[in-house]
Amino acid sequence: MSHVVPAGRHTVTPRIVVEDAAALVAFLKRVFDATGEFQSDAPSQIRIGDSLLMVSKAGPRETFPAFLYVYVEDAEATCERALDAGALSLEAVWETPYGDRRGMVRDPWGNVWQIATPGRR
């Protein structure tokens, strides 16, 4: 099978639709050191590490939260930043059976983020 993926993207690109897209973009920058800017007239293209996440304001589309697994350098510090930015802790950081250190938070828009530091396997 042959397909074309635009430069800088992956085959699958998650998209989150929320009421206040600008605030979610600010949250992502604060918590994950994301890059990219809020765009009011198109989906905002936000990068977390090597991945692209599209963030849209509700309107033509209804709100739709996401459940995402994100690898970071320091799961504890990233979870703490998320809590400081208004997220709710769903699971304290712990050592998973497969080796990742992972915590879980829900952001103010209902998105769930599993935040992990890779295991040493």
Residue map of PLM features:
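Vicinal oxygen chelate
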Residues: 1-7, 11-19, 44-47, 58-121
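Short beta-strand-to-loop elements that line the ligand-binding cleft
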Residues: 14-16, 37-38, 92-95
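Conserved active-site alpha-helix within GNAT-family acetyltransferase domains
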Residues: 22-30, 103, 112
